Structures are given as structure tokens and as C-alpha cells.
Amino acid sequence: MERLNNMGKNSIKKVTVVGTGVIGNGWISRFLSQGYDVVATDPAKNAEVRMRQSIENAWPALEKQGLAEGASKDRLTFELDLAKAVADADLIQENVPEREALKRRVLAEIDHFSKSEAIIASSTSGLKPSILQEDCQRPERVIVAHPFNPVYLIPLVEVIGGKDTSPETINISEQFYQSIKMKPLVISTEVEGHIADRLMEAIWREALHLINDGVATTEEVDAAIIYGPGLRWALMGPFLTLHLAGGEQGMRYMLEQFGPALKLPWTKLVAPELTNELANRVVEGCEAQTTGYSIKKLEQRRDEFLIELIQLLEKYWPGANLKGKL
């Protein structure tokens, strides 16, 4: 613990990424773009080939956004052996599939093979850190650091400690993620799904009901968000959006006038059964929306849009942060 106490964000020089799927590769791209040495490991067949292709696809967007001094794709090493991959790392970012038993086993192995002062961060989208750290000998250095796709562009990362996580680990992690141009949201209370995913899941469930009940197509649901609340949500969250909707009296008027409507049975909340019929309608709808575009092309268009959107956010909402008032 004493060695961990002496660490800071500047002590993190080498990063290891465990698991090179979409999220893992996103982390690799971000770390490299910020000038870090990165070791990646994944036992899957052809993992290294797919990883390097993913980084190549992301790099033009990162160059447009601006690379840190010393940033290079050449600072990436692939190591098949987990023990060797984590041995010298100052921070290990775990991204294995979202299965509790698997994550606990891998995190315990990382804990065993890594340096005692290294921070171990899980990218889990839903599991509590207290559960993930149960099999670790040094649970005080284990946290959840949940990012959002594409990780190399989206700044939010939810940072959560478990019951045994030390305050030092949280502080160092927060500083580190800030240093790589992210917006760490430190969540003090553990809950499944953290914050952002719980909000997104609520919308996702309602969207599935609208498709299942024949109310709308996937394209119409997406359009309802893109040209409506999505534009406002890019600048303000649900609370500030409704605060403005209340006029001069703000949220107080909003709650007085529309609070009773919360009891109307509009929303379903519980997800519909994902039958083959519903799944097919969703898949076919998405494929129809993207006719003529490859996933790679769509990712490039998304990245270009996000870069400009993030720049606009900083221009019009420069005071927004996670520590104080706007």
C-alpha cells in the first residue's frame, strides 16, 4: 500500500490492455495517442491482426483531434502470455467478455502476476467492483473504469471503487484519466450498470417496445432521438434540459406542472421478450438504415462528427465539469 501511496498519474508510464475487442482496442488507441507505451494481450485467434487493423482505422480521427508528443503506433507490443504482459505495467485495463466468473478469474490472475503498486481497472459495463475484487490478494488497487464507445474519442469514464478499494487508488486513477483527455466521473455508490448505462438501458427498453408493438421502425426511433432530444442532450443532460423547459421558474415550475404526468403509464420499463421475430425486425431495420455503407465507413463518419461535436461542446459549455458548478 505504501508504494501505491507514492504513485501519481505521472508514475504511470506503461499500460497493459487485457482483451482486444472493440473496447480494448479503443483503449489501446487512446493510450497510444497520448504517448504511452502499451502492451496488449488476448488469447483469441488472430487477435493481434484485428487489433492492429482497428488502430489503423482509429488513427486518422486521433490525428485530426491532435496527438500528444511522442504518440506513435510503434509503441504498441502484443504479448500472448498474460503474466509477461502485465509484469511491468503501472496500470492494467481489463476488457474481457462481460461474464462475472471470467472477469473474476482474469482479474485474480492479473493481481497475482502484476506489480504490487500497479492499478487494475476493469471496463465492466455492469458489474460491481466489490464483486470483481473478491478473489484478489490486493483488492485495494482494483477499480472499475467504464468507458464508452468509441473509447478513443468519447471522454466519459465512470470510475468506481469497491469496498476494499483505497482512496489513493481512486485519486490516482482520476488524475490519470484526466491526463489522457478523459472526463472521469467518480461514482461513490456501487450499483449495477453504474450511471450512464442505466439511463441508456431505459431508452433501449422503450425503443424495443416501440418496435415490438409496431409503433415505429428502427429508423423512426433513431430519427426521434437524432433530431429531437439528442440535440439537446449533446449539450445538457435531462435535468438541465427540463430546468430550461420550466421557463423563468426553472425546475420548480416544471415539477409542479408536469410532475403528476410521471404517474401516467406511458413507459413500459421492463424490456419486452427478445423473440426471434423482434430480433429479426431490429436487425433488418438497422441493415435497411445502413444500406450502401460498410461498418468501417460508418465508424469514420461517426468519428468525424464526434470530433466536431466535442469541439462545439468545449466552445459553448467550457465551464462544464464534474467537480463544480457550470
Swiss-Prot record:
GO cellular component terms, semicolon-separated: cytoplasm
Cellular compartment(s): Cytoplasm
Classification via InterPro entries: 3-OHacyl-CoA_DH_NAD-bd, 3HC_DH_C, 6-PGluconate_DH-like_C_sf, 6PGD_dom2, L-carnitine_dehydrogenase, NAD(P)-bd_dom_sf
Pathway annotation: Amine and polyamine metabolism; carnitine metabolism
Assigned protein family: Belongs to the 3-hydroxyacyl-CoA dehydrogenase family. L-carnitine dehydrogenase subfamily.
Keyword DNA-binding recorded: no
The protein's assembly and partners: Homodimer.
Keywords from the named record: Cytoplasm, NAD, Oxidoreductase, Plasmid
Primary role: Catalyzes the NAD(+)-dependent oxidation of L-carnitine to 3-dehydrocarnitine.
Name of this protein: L-carnitine dehydrogenase
Alphabetical list of Gene3D superfamilies matching this protein: N-(1-d-carboxylethyl)-l-norvaline Dehydrogenase, domain 2, NAD(P)-binding Rossmann-like Domain
Catalysis: reaction(s): carnitine + NAD(+) = 3-dehydrocarnitine + NADH + H(+)
Organism: Bacillus cereus (strain ZK / E33L)
Residues noted as binding NAD(+) in the record, renumbered to the chain: G19, T20, G21, V22, I23, G24
